[in-house]
Structure formats: structure tokens, C-alpha cells
């Protein structure tokens, strides 16, 4: 499973785009729309913290797209105060449904606890071991010196063997197939599944089964 750890800012609306520049979101200039959704203290900053901001581009039917994870996150890299436009690292298509999102430690912590709970419910039993891969931008540096993702897993499964690493990105199963993502945490839990014994046999085989 994947924890994106983003705070969603507002609803997805149709965007007017020119290359990598988002000119409008809904009926408002893109920069105005972004500022409207930001926390008040961030709107007053001399320079916006672009390293924390992203645009979510919805795929398919916009209804419940955010809840179902049918979107890609594209980092914001610049804003034009004269044109009131916002520049992304990748060009969206004109008319795409776009929403704004922000990296936030509390949102990431809540999302990781949600993921751990969902995977535990799907597994249905205590896992034998787990794998946790986190982006360098999501580890202790992001959480003020402690890895709250790791703490969430250990709190739910104390004593469970856990292997992991920090990296510059992760490859994870997304709605549109396996994709490389950033600033996220990927968790897999593994448990034993009992295979049905063959007729007349009293032996039982087990095999490791992942829950991603």
C-alpha cells in the first residue's frame, strides 16, 4: 500500500492550461485559486514554499477520484504574479480536472495510520514480517527528527520483523499501474496462507503471501 501523505486543498476543477502553465482553475486565475486554498499564514509569505505544493490531476470520472486515489501529483515549481499562473513540472492537458495539495506532517502521519489499519484488516491476521520503503523527503527530516511512519507500523505490530530503506523515490502499484512516486511511503505486510490439503493427505503447506 502507498501513503502519499498530502493534505488535499479543495475540490478538483477544470483547468485552462498552456504547456506546463496552469492559467485558470475553474473560473479563477490559477494563482488566485491556489492562494485561496492555502493556510492564511502561508498566503502572506514573501515566497511560496513550492517544495511543499503540488497539483493533483484527476484521471477519469472526477466523482470520488480523490477518495479512490485516481490522480497523479505534479510538483509546483513557480508562479507568475503578473499572469497569475502556476507552473508545474509536467504539462497537464487543457480541461483536466485539477486540485491543489500540500505536503504536511500531520496529514502524512494520519494517512500512514490509515494505511497500516487498512492493510491489517485485509491481512486478517498478525503479519509475519513487513517491508517499508520511504522517500528521503518523507523520513525523519520531514517529521522533525523522528520517523513517524516507522513509529506507526511498530505501534500497530510491536515486535514484527521489518525491513526497509530510504530512497529518492519508490516504485509502487497505483491506479494506472506501477509508477515511480516521490515523497511517499510504501508498506507491504506478509502473512502465511494455508493451502488446502489434497485428498487423503494430512499435511498442510504454507506459503508467504504479500498484502500490498
Positions of predicted regions on the chain:
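Small-residue-enriched flexible segments
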Residues: 1-143, 147-160, 165-212
Amino acid at each position: 500500500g502507498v501513503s502519499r501523505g498530502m493534505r488535499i486543498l479543495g475540490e478538483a476543477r477544470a483547468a485552462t492550461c498552456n504547456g506546463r502553465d496552469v492559467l485558470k482553475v475553474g473560473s479563477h486565475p490559477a494563482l488566485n485559486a491556489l492562494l485561496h486554498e492555502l493556510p492564511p499564514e502561508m498566503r502572506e509569505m514573501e515566497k511560496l514554499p513550492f517544495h511543499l505544493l503540488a497539483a493533483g490531476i484527476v484521471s477519469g470520472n472526477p466523482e470520488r477520484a480523490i477518495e479512490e486515489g485516481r490522480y497523479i501529483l505534479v510538483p509546483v515549481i513557480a508562479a507568475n504574479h503578473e499572469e497569475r499562473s502556476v507552473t508545474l513540472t509536467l504539462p497537464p492537458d487543457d480541461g483536466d480536472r485539477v486540485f491543489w495539495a500540500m505536503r504536511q506532517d500531520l496529514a502524512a502521519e494520519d494517512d500512514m495510520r490509515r494505511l497500516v489499519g487498512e492493510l491489517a484488516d485485509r491481512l486478517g491476521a498478525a503479519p509475519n514480517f513487513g517491508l517499508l520503503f520511504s522517500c528521503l523527503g518523507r523520513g525523519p527530516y520531514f517529521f522533525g527528527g523522528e520517523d513517524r511512519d516507522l513509529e506507526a507500523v511498530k505501534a500497530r505490530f510491536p515486535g514484527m520483523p521489518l525491513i526497509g530503506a530510504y530512497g529518492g523515490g519508490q516504485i509502487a502499484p497505483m491506479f494506472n499501474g506501477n509508477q515511480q512516486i516521490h515523497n511517499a511511503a510504501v508498506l507491504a505486510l506478509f502473512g502465511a496462507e494455508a493451502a488446502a490439503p489434497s485428498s487423503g493427505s494430512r499435511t498442510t503447506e504454507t506459503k508467504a503471501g504479500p498484502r500490498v
